[in-house]
């Protein structure tokens, strides 16, 4: 969980569905497959995945008196003890150094608000189950980065959470190998129909609209698609319209300013994005520092940031 400046209390993450908790991601694969990750507006302490392995480099000061082989043996013993859920006073036969280090490790675990999944599992972003809450996902990345895959996952979960609602697709492409394989497939809206008869916003009451690579439209198509995006972004809360806007650009001056201001979630692909573009977006719209943005580069293929309180950050294996 990434700490964003301005928060007085650090919100907590857990698998516990308690009052006030909001779902943010679903675990796919591994031991925790099917579990939902919730965010709490306080420092709630709840169930989490098993901690990942202990990294000796984080405790070099405590380990410096030991030989390399002894360090490995000690870390392995403490790893086994932590996996069993043992307290420090339950370490029978352990050295004083080992017990002291183990207490430090457990203290670090208690303070850590982040969650890391093993390689055999991953997070999938979850839309809100609240029928009265609409969301705006801004998903930006180069061609082939996986924007359609992320959008498909969100839209399919939206349909499961709200089975009576429709998912619409507005795209320049007549066919999409990812989005069109949703089950059931999204209902396509032709660009020409928007040009010929611009729709009233009430026609998008209680639904989800996917705008696929909307920045590639030109001419009249560009005008009507951008107008519809702007109208739904600013007034879609009245029609309860969730939006998934896929773009090649992280920022594009006036064309993206309004949408980015209204977005509830921003999904980016740090490893395939220039540091300048990434840091500008995250500093301007999230409040991240340059060091925060450098950390994003280490978090995997994609990163999703929730802009509103309580703010959170989630990637493929980390939250």
Residue map of PLM features:
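Conserved AAA+ ATPase small/helical "lid" subdomain
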Residues: 289-319
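Phosphate-binding P-loop
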Residues: 124-134
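Conformational switch/transducer regions in large eukaryotic molecular machines and scaffolds
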Residues: 83, 96-100, 110-114, 118-122, ...
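N-terminal pre-Walker A segment at the start of P-loop NTPase domains
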Residues: 16-125
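Conserved P-loop NTPase motor cores
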Residues: 134-157, 172-176, 189-290
């Amino acid at each position: 969980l990434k700490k964003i400046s301005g928060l007085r209390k650090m919100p907590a993450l857990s698998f516990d569905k308690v009052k006030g908790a909001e779902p943010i991601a679903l675990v796919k694969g591994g031991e925790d497959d099917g579990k939902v990750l919730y965010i709490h507006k306080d420092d709630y302490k709840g169930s989490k995945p098993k901690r990942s392995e202990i990294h000796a480099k984080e405790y070099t000061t405590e380990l410096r008196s030991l030989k390399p082989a002894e360090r490995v043996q000690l870390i392995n013993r403490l790893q086994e003890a932590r996996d069993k859920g043992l307290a420090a006073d339950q370490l029978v036969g352990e050295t004083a150094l080992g017990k002291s280090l183990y207490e430090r490790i457990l203290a670090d675990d208690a303070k850590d608000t982040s969650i890391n999944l093993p390689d055999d599992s991953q997070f999938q972003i979850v839309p809100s189950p609240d029928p009265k809450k609409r969301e705006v996902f801004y998903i930006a990345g180069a061609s082939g980065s996986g924007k359609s895959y992320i959008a498909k996952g969100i839209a399919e979960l939206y349909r499961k959470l709200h089975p009576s609602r429709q998912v619409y697709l507005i795209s320049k492409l007549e066919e999409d190998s990812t989005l069109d394989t949703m089950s059931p497939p999204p209902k396509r809206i032709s660009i020409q129909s928007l040009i010929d008869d611009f729709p009233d916003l009430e026609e998008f009451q209680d639904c989800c609209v996917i705008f696929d690579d909307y920045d590639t439209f030109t001419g009249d198509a560009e005008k009507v698609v951008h107008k519809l995006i702007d109208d739904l972004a600013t007034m879609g809360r009245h029609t309860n319209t969730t939006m998934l806007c896929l773009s090649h650009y992280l920022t594009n001056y006036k064309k993206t300013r309004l949408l980015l201001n209204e977005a509830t979630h921003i999904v980016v692909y740090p490893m395939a994005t220039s540091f300048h573009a990434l840091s500008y977006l995250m500093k301007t719209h999230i409040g991240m520092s340059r060091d925060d943005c450098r950390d994003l580069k280490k978090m995997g293929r994609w990163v999703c940031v929730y802009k509103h309180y309580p703010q959170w950050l989630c990637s493929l294996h980390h939250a």
